[in-house]
Design a protein with these regions (language model features):
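Short C-terminal tail/terminal secondary-structure segment
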Residues: 4, 93-96, 234-235, 246-260
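Conserved glycine-rich cofactor-binding loop
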Residues: 14-15
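Short, small/polar-rich loop/turn modules that mediate ligand/substrate recognition or access, typified
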Residues: 87, 134, 176, 181, ...
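Substrate-binding pocket helix/loop in short-chain dehydrogenase/reductase
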Residues: 97-99, 103-111, 137, 215
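Active-site helix of classical SDR
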Residues: 122, 160, 168
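Alpha-helical segment proximal to the catalytic Tyr-Lys
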Residues: 127, 173-177, 243
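Residue(s) in the substrate-gating loop at a strand-loop-helix junction
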Residues: 142
């Protein structure tokens, strides 16, 4: 198997893209630490991996909390003995509202989960990757903030996704000498549960009409992508087949962002 003997940390690992990535990495032989804040969902995902013959453990932590993240990351390494792969998938859409409507607390929450959470994950995981002599990091960004800016009111979300890509490209240079690769996947419209935590308010005030060619997603005629399709790319970036790729965003959107 492609990742036999490797250990992976996946934040947001119990749902959506994170869960799909956890299942995919485990199926290829990786031992996976699934990190999230809902223990019951984590336990269910771990059982699913184990039922398929894989190895996994649940790590309950808030990605914005340094103490919880430090404990969780250390527990993973203590349990499996090493760390080779990090998938920073935890994130929220947050509140989408005009800039003069979204409150400071709403803004701060999106920034905290998506940007501070990414920072905290990498801040605490990179020392273990350095100790291991290398590794691969995959950050889950978005077409929003990197190619697409026409989702009205998504300013906080887009800022975090642009920020994640900046982190990836900055760290590609910083971490290269340690044989640590870092890349980003930028999904478009994907069938996940993330829309359940999107709170849209007065979006019409922040929206600009967009002229669409026929078919919202050219490759599929409008059909959304799947978390498993994103996970396939995460698997590629996690393994040795992408050994000369770093600092690179990959848009997984069926050409959707090229229309906007």
């Amino acid at each position: 198997m492609e990742l036999s003997g490797k250990v992976a940390l996946v934040t947001g690992g119990a749902s959506g893209i994170g869960k799909a990535a956890s299942l995919k990495l485990a199926a290829e032989g990786a031992m996976v630490g699934l990190l999230g804040h809902t223990k019951s969902e984590l336990d269910d995902a771990v059982r699913e991996i184990e039922a398929a013959g894989g190895k996994a453990m649940a790590l309950t932590a808030d990605v914005t909390d340094e103490s919880e993240m430090r404990t969780a990351t250390a527990s993973l390494v203590e349990h499996f003995g090493r760390l080779d792969i990090v998938v920073a998938s935890a994130g929220i859409n947050g509140v989408w509202a005009p800039i003069d409507d979204i409150t400071p607390d709403e803004w701060d929450k999106t920034i905290a989960v998506n940007l501070r959470g990414t920072y905290m994950t990498l801040h605490l995981a990179v020392p273990y990757l350095k100790k291991q002599g290398g590794g691969s990091i995959v950050v889950i960004s978005s077409i929003n903030g990197t190619r697409t800016f026409s989702n009205g009111g998504a300013t906080a979300y887009a800022a975090t996704k642009a920020g994640q890509l900046a982190i990836v490209q900055q760290l590609a240079l910083e971490l290269g000498k340690h044989r640590i690769r870092i890349n980003a996947v930028c999904p478009g419209a994907i069938v996940t549960e993330i829309d359940d935590n999107t709170h849209k308010r007065n979006q019409e005030e922040a929206s600009v009409p967009v002229e669409w060619p026929a078919g919202e997603i050219p490759l599929t005629g409008g059909e959304y992508g799947t978390a498993e399709e994103v996970a396939d790319t995460i698997l590629f970036l996690a393994g040795d087949r992408s050994r000369h790729i770093t600092g690179t965003p990959i848009w997984i959107d069926g050409g959707q962002s090229l229309l906007r």
